[in-house]
């Protein structure tokens, strides 16, 4: 199963100077992310995967084919289609769950190919230099669940299929 996982502000804000605009403000969102990705393969761009660890497997999507230590594979999505990348990952990697973790262009490119989307909406505006377009990411999707965070009413956790 391929999924996308993202959190964004009211206007799609997801990044500022290489970090989350709300970095450190929402521990429950961080816990949700880590819980979902703990036993999954993370797939994302260099800016989206901040830390490489043998305990947190990942594949990079990058035109720079240099493979960081503790990264399983690097895919150049300028040369390979989303379908080719997903098929190769499916063939090579035994993880049942594979999660797209960013960046913006990769979220948009994979939106119609993923089986499920985990979206954390933050009911607040943020300064940002990176925004996602939720109309692309959620096109032709149905919301299957929604819940407010226990600790902060600004957070809403949604699941889309």
Language-model segments: which ranges?
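Enzymes that bind and transform nitrogen-containing heteroaromatic metabolites
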Residues: 1-161
């Amino acid at each position: 199963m391929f999924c996308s996982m993202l959190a964004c502000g009211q206007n799609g804000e997801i990044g500022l100077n290489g970090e989350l605009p709300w970095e450190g403000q929402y521990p429950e969102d961080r816990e949700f992310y880590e819980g979902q990705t703990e036993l999954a393969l993370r797939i994302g761009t260099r800016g989206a995967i901040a830390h490489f660890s043998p305990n947190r497997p990942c594949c990079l999507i990058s035109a720079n084919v240099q493979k960081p230590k503790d990264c399983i594979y690097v895919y150049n999505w300028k040369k390979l289609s989303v379908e080719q990348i997903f098929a190769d990952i499916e063939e090579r990697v035994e993880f049942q769950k594979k999660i797209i973790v960013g960046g913006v262009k990769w979220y948009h490119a994979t939106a119609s190919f993923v089986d499920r989307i985990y979206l954390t909406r933050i009911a607040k505006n943020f300064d940002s230099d990176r925004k996602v377009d939720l109309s692309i990411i959620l096109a032709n999707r149905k919301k299957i669940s929604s819940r407010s965070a226990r600790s902060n009413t600004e957070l809403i956790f949604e699941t889309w299929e």
